[in-house]
């Protein structure tokens, strides 16, 4: 079976500091995979390398059979990899549904022009994102919160909203 995500001898240095040293791992479809370690062990740095925020000092990252080493985060996201961050980064004065719909921005074709003038493309994209966002909220158990402002949610639910947005 082909791996969803694979790291081969990935290292990342900050000057002389070895934050990540020769990490090799393979995640198959359906796997539940955890990365554990003490503070400062390099876990976040490793995820930053995998998602394109940092370029590895050495090694290779492969996503769905395709090398993504050194690609910028937006290109990696377009290939289907998403992530959340340690600090919650929701739009606090938008609803849960609106926060999840924002996660679809890389999949829609609407431009600022089409949104401004409410073109056919805009309405098609709006319909698609609305339907899919509601589906995701239902799948992660957040549908009852869809009209709630993110700012009014407890921390744990806010984290789930971030995960739902990453799934978009």
Region locations from a protein language model:
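The feature captures the beta-strand-to-loop junction immediately N-terminal to the Walker
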Residues: 33-38
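Helix-to-loop junction immediately C-terminal to a conserved catalytic motif
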Residues: 51
């Amino acid at each position: 079976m082909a791996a969803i995500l694979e790291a081969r001898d990935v290292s990342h240095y900050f000057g002389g500091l070895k934050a990540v040293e020769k990490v090799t791992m393979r995640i198959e479809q359906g796997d539940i995979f955890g990365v554990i370690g003490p503070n400062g062990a390099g876990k976040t740095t490793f995820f930053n390398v995998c998602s394109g925020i940092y370029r590895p000092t050495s090694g290779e990252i492969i996503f769905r059979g395709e090398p993504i080493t050194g690609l910028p985060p937006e290109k990696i996201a377009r290939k289907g990899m998403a992530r959340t961050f340690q600090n919650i980064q929701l739009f606090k004065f938008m609803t849960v549904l609106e926060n999840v719909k924002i996660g679809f921005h890389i999949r829609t074709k609407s431009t600022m022009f089409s949104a401004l003038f409410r073109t056919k493309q805009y309405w098609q994209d709006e319909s698609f994102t609305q339907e899919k966002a509601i589906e995701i909220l239902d799948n992660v158990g957040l549908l009852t919160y869809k009209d709630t402002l993110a700012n009014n949610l407890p921390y744990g639910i806010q984290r789930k909203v971030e995960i739902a947005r990453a799934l978009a």
